[in-house]
From Swiss-Prot:
The keyword Cell membrane applies. It is a single-pass membrane protein. Keywords: Cell membrane, Glycoprotein, Lectin, Membrane, Repeat, Signal, Transmembrane, Transmembrane helix. Residues 367-381 have a biased composition (Acidic residues). This is Protein eva-1 homolog C. Residues 67-159, 168-260 form the SUEL-type lectin domain. Residues 1-48 form the signal peptide. Residues 1-23, 364-384 are annotated as: Disordered. PROSITE patterns: SUEL_LECTIN (PS50228). GO terms for cellular component: extracellular region; plasma membrane. Residues 1-13 have a biased composition (Pro residues). Belongs to the EVA1 family. It is found in: Cell membrane.
Length: 440
């Protein structure tokens, strides 16, 4: 109780442990701020993952673009990728570029197709990141159908800059192989020979082509044969890929391909999972598929170790992925709070237990000290008694020995006297009869 006029005493200083506990208990506001920052960062990471999954989709899917006469055809691929033309068509159309169908076009059932379309698009757009091509009949050669509306249709892929390339000479076997849980995806292929390209087949003296003779139908052939398979074998010859060059020219097949994880490719093209590796025959190209050379990966459970599979799953199930992510974050925060509360409570209990143990230790130490003092006193008393006894013995033993010696000496003297008297008496008795005898 404070008396009036007396100042209030200053508060007692808090120990370092109490201050540490207060620091441990106070941070809920900081945890909330940390939680908000984590949510923002994770939302940015989720959007980045979504962008990356879209990037992968652009690299795997076939893209189609078209433009009518007088317009520009625009082809573009994302960063670190280039255009790989799959096919090109330039001809007339009644629906895409013309609102009304002329009578002349109705009566003409022939389709006006320019045979140089694919080569022209390849020259302008192949291996470019972006391509802008003016659609005009003069670009693709003579106009076979003057006065009719025509359009340019191009199918292409965006091939990454880092691809697997393989070149096989004529009359040799092409073998493509991917590791487990990955599928083949063919980006480009050409069969023939370029004029300026060195001889990679080492055939010795041979006839050089006067112009580039390449057959790009090899892309369609290999796509049918190897797309979505784990292994692929095909014989490189004119029977399968045609003969684009003059007789005597040594040709070769160049392929650019990639091995794509199973989950990603099936997410982009679900038809890949339904491919049947049974024996097939392609009537168009006369190709017989051999299931021993081309096969689909077994549908057993395979553990995908590639992190890209996670991006494919996030792309296919964005809501579920976001829900799982937020749930994991909330569970982690709850576990952190529980651990913090347990730590604070356990620290308090441990401190009280330590204090009680210290009191017990101090009491036991005092009891041990008292018992040790009592034992020391008893030991000192016990040690004093033998000392006194020994002292008594040391003082009494000489006196006792002298008295006994005197008695013993007295007894010896008495004994000697008795013996002497006996001998004297015995001597007198023996001498009397002898004297008496002489007398008588």
């Amino acid at each position: 109780m404070l008396l009036p006029g007396h100042p209030r005493p200053p508060p007692a200083p808090q120990s370092a442990q109490n201050q540490g506990l207060r620091r441990q208990v106070e941070p809920p506001g900081q945890l909330l701020r940390l939680f908000y920052c984590t949510v923002l960062v994770c939302s940015k990471e989720t959007s980045a993952l979504t962008d990356f999954s879209g990037y992968l989709t652009k690299l795997l899917q076939n893209h189609t673009a078209y433009a009518c006469d007088g317009d520009y055809l625009n082809l573009q691929c994302p960063r670190h990728s280039t255009i790989s033309v799959q096919s090109a068509f330039y001809g007339q159309d009644y629906q895409m570029c013309s609102s009304q169908e002329p009578i002349s076009q109705r009566e003409d059932n022939l389709t006006c197709v320019a045979s140089t379309t694919l080569q022209k698009v390849l020259d302008e757009c192949q291996n470019q990141r972006a391509c802008h091509l003016l659609v005009n009949s003069r670009v693709f050669g003579p106009d076979l159908c003057p006065g009719s509306s025509k359009y340019l249709l191009v199918s292409f892929k965006c091939q990454p800059n880092e691809l697997k390339n393989k070149t096989v000479c004529e009359n040799q076997e092409l073998k493509l192989h991917c590791h487990e849980s990955k599928f083949l995806n063919i980006y480009s292929a050409a069969y023939g020979r370029r004029t300026q390209q060195r001889d990679i087949c080492s055939s010795g003296a041979e006839l050089l082509p006067p112009f580039d003779c390449l057959s790009y139908t090899a892309l369609q052939v290999l796509s049918r044969r190897c797309y979505g398979k784990q292994r692929c074998k095909v014989l490189v010859d004119n029977y399968h890929f045609g003969s684009p060059c003059l007789p005597g020219v040594k040709k070769y097949l160049t392929v650019a391909y990639a091995c794509v994880p199973k989950n990603i490719l099936t997410a982009v093209d679900p038809a890949v999972a339904n491919l049947n590796p049974s024996l097939k025959k392609d009537d168009e190209h006369g190709i017989t598929f051999n299931p021993s050379g081309s096969r689909v990966v077994r549908k057993d459970g395979v553990i995908v170790s590639n992190s890209l599979a996670a991006f494919a799953y996030i792309r296919a199930h964005p809501e579920r992925a976001a829900l799982l992510f937020m749930s994991s974050v909330c569970i982690g925060l709850l576990l952190t709070l529980c651990a913090l509360v347990i730590r604070v409570s356990c620290t308090k209990d441990f401190r009280e237990l330590r204090q009680g143990r210290e009191h017990l230790v101090l009491g036991s130490d005092k009891a041990e000290e008292d018992s040790e003092e009592d034992l020391e006193e008893e030991d000192s008393s016990d040690s004093q008694f033998p000392e006194e006894l020994s002292r008594f013995c040391r003082t009494s033993y000489p006196a006792y020995s002298s008295i006994e010696a005197a008695e013993l000496a007295e007894r010896i003297e008495r004994r000697e006297q008795v013996i002497q008297e006996i001998w004297m008496n015995s001597g007198l008795d023996s001498s009397l009869p002898r004297n008496v005898g002489h007398f008588y």
